[in-house]
Amino acid sequence: MAKRVSLPDVVISAPKAVFKPAKEEALACILPKYYKSMADVSIKTNSVIDKCWFCNQDLVFRPISIETFKGGEVGYFCSKICRDSLASMVKSHVALREEPKISLLPLVFYEDKEKVINTINLLRDKDGVYGSCYFKENSQIIDISLRSLL
């Protein structure tokens, strides 16, 4: 049988099993001596809060943002379609909390931008929408395919 030992002078304030030291931000860029940095610029993010960052429509109600991995938010969007479309474009540069479910090309790709904006407005309040768009190179047509299980 094991003996119980009391240690009155020992205080365990943060056991190793519970305490995890906070990691500092990673270094942005370390170049070996044989590389020469050609550009090193830091720029604040866009501060426009009254227009959707994807479709440029006026935001007349509470905007939606992209959630980052560390719990922050970036961007202002009129719908989940716009939010997810931009998130799918920037996911290699911004650590996202969740994978985007919709991926549309930027509006500059489309000849009839109003058709795309009408689709965004039609599905703005729908939940469970997912899908993508497909570029047909031979006919220069973009097919938008958005679906829902609900």
From Swiss-Prot:
It holds the Pfam family Pox_TAA1. InterPro entries: Poxvirus_VLTF2, Znf_MYM. GO terms for molecular function: zinc ion binding. Belongs to the chordopoxvirinae VLTF-2 family. Acts with RNA polymerase to initiate transcription from late gene promoters. Interacts with itself. Interacts with the late transcription factors VLTF-1. This is Viral late gene transcription factor 2. It comes from Vaccinia virus (strain Ankara) (VACV). The gene is VLTF2.
